């Protein structure tokens, strides 16, 4: 009974796209400059945590630690007060890359479950690297995005 309720909550949460959690708006309604400005301001930690919570893979792989570069314990300690914790612009850009990638992979593979499966296992196009492991680097993010584009358009080498 509890699992069914939890799944229903997750389904309701997943109705929002990952980038919508961070931007607090539909990214299609924002100009690229506005997205840049919001990222430069820094996303709120709570919004990043909410975005990560919709993904079993992102939760299991401790993506928040990858984004902020701090241990889970340090993050918890900093988040305890009543103050709003904001990520730096660099951390926010990395969070946005993870959100964008999950959206793109979901679009390409049709479901978030299939997208997460692909993101979490070695990829031949990435010379055996796991897509999730290379996303926090801007060049790695672009390589994974290019790979998804090739899959989407049926271009394999």
Predicted ranges, named:
Residues 1-157:
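Non-transmembrane "mature" sequence context
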């Amino acid at each position: 009974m509890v699992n069914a309720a939890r799944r229903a909550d997750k389904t309701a949460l997943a109705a929002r796209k990952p980038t919508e959690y961070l931007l607090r708006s539909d990214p299609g309604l924002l100009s690229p400059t506005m997205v840049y400005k919001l990222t430069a301001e820094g996303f709120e930690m709570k919004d990043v945590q909410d975005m990560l919570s919709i993904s079993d893979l992102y939760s299991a792989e401790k993506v928040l630690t990858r984004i902020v570069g701090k241990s889970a314990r340090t993050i918890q300690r900093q988040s305890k007060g009543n103050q709003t914790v904001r990520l730096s612009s660099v951390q926010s850009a990395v969070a946005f890359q993870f959100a964008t990638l999950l959206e793109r992979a979901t679009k390409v593979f049709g479901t978030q479950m299939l997208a997460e499966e692909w993101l979490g296992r070695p990829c031949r196009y990435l010379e055996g690297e796991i897509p999730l492991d290379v996303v926090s680097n801007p060049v790695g993010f672009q390589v994974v995005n290019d790979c998804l584009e090739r899959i989407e358009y049926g271009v394999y080498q």
